[in-house]
């Protein structure tokens, strides 16, 4: 260390007065989790910010009740009597319910109502409840309208097909073809009054063609 550094070290003065002792106001302990020094303003916890102690598992809930909420001996005794009364009423109602269920089973046995019949009745009642709802009625009406529209569409398609067939039958091409078939029939198998069905004309022409192409019978041995 040279002389210059020695001079700077000697000229340095600490801002703290160590001879005056330690200011105890800066020292504090916080075992409760409070990180603010003594005397500093703290944030009051109200409403949602309030942290109430939560009982641990197995801890008696009564131990967490504050001193202002502690019940007196008379109040505790009254609550115990009320608790015993409620438990007795629950037990009585359970016994009454068991007796009613037994009586109900006996009535069903006498009426011949078995589990299957009861299930059918429940299903029928459930279906009636479903059909009575507005949603089911609306859906049924929608499906009915859709079916009517589909029937009308099929009917219109059939009408269009029938009209197309009639147009084809009345067309000049079809009539010319029908006349040619009739002429062929008249040449092959003779004339037939006009007005016949087109199917009959075709059948007659086919029969006539089969007759003309039938082979001649062979001569018997006697003619020889």
Curated annotation (Swiss-Prot):
GO CC term, one of those recorded: perinuclear region of cytoplasm
GO biological process: anatomical structure morphogenesis; B cell differentiation; positive regulation of cell population proliferation; secretion
Residues annotated with Phosphoserine modification: 36, 40, 176, 223
One Pfam entry name: TPD52
Keyword Transcription listed: no
GO MF entries: calcium ion binding; protein homodimerization activity
Tissue note: Isoform 2 is expressed in colon, breast, prostate, pancreas and kidney tumor cell lines. Isoform 2 is expressed at high levels in kidney, prostate, brain, small intestine and pancreas, at moderate levels in placenta and colon, at low levels in lung, liver and heart, and at very low levels in spleen, thymus, peripheral mononuclear blood cells, testis and ovary.
InterPro entries tied to this protein: TPD52
Listed Low complexity bias regions: 203-213
Coiled-coil residue windows: 62-114
Keyword annotations from UniProtKB, A to Z: Coiled coil, Phosphoprotein
Ranges where the record places region Disordered: 187-224
Keyword Coiled coil: yes
Family to which this protein belongs: Belongs to the TPD52 family.
Assembly mode: Forms a homodimer or heterodimer with other members of the family. All isoforms interact with several 14-3-3 proteins.
Name the record gives this protein: Tumor protein D52
């Amino acid at each position: 260390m040279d002389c210059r550094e020695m001079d700077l070290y000697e000229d340095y003065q600490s801002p703290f007065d160590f001879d005056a002792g330690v200011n105890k106001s800066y020292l504090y302990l916080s075992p409760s989790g409070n990180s603010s020094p003594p005397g500093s303003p703290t944030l009051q916890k109200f409403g949602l910010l309030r942290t109430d102690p939560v009982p641990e598992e197995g801890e008696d809930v009564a131990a967490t009740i504050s001193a202002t909420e502690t019940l007196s001996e008379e109040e505790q005794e009254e609550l115990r009597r009320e608790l015993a009364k409620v438990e007795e009423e629950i037990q009585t109602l359970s016994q009454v319910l068991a007796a009613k269920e037994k009586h109900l089973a006996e009535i069903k046995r006498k009426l011949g109502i078995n589990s299957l019949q009861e299930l059918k009745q429940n299903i029928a009642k459930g279906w009636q409840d479903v059909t009575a709802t507005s949603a089911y009625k609306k859906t049924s009406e929608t499906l009915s309208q859709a079916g009517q529209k589909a029937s009308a569409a099929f009917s219109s398609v059939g009408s269009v097909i029938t009209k197309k067939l009639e147009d084809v039958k009345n067309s000049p091409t079809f009539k010319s073809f029908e006349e040619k078939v009739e002429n062929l029939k008249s040449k092959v198998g003779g004339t037939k009054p006009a007005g016949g069905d087109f199917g009959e004309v075709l059948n007659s022409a086919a029969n006539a063609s089969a007759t003309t192409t039938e082979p001649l019978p062979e001569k018997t041995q006697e003619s020889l």
